[in-house]
Amino acid sequence: MAEMFDNTIKKDRVLLAAVDTGSYDVELSLDELEELTETAGGEVIARVTQKRPSFDSGTCIGSGRLEEMAEICRNENIDRIVFDCELTATQIRNIEDVCGVFTIDRTMLILDIFAQRATTREGRLQVEIAQNKYRLPRLAGMGTNMSRLGGGIGTRGPGESKLETDKRHIRTR
């Protein structure tokens, strides 16, 4: 008897996060971010905002609110967090360490939408270039093992870290 497979694409369960510094309408911006998330194929499960005079340099959002986000991620089976501001590599790593969930910012979400929609070879290459330019300074800490030793074909010899290999690969592309 033939087995039946579920061919439906599972939508990512997404948590939206924003910091309200008072410089713009956070709810309006989150509404737009929710529409972008749905365009990218995600399902927004929850929103978290925090009023702060400025962004936290380590996590963008305060530690108490970050713990609350981690709890939401566990309870709601969140697959991805999307922040409504630009995040540094350190902020991404710190957020992922606390919440245990893949984290991106608004710009990466928009680039992902372009990547999904690009149909021509030239369009796909342009999107790949844009993604690589955006990811290059954010590579530090991405992935689970960045201290891998090289030494194989195509590396710079023993001791080349995964980070260095990835950066060289992106520059070459």
State what each model feature region is.
Residues 109-173:
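Extended, highly charged alpha-helical segments
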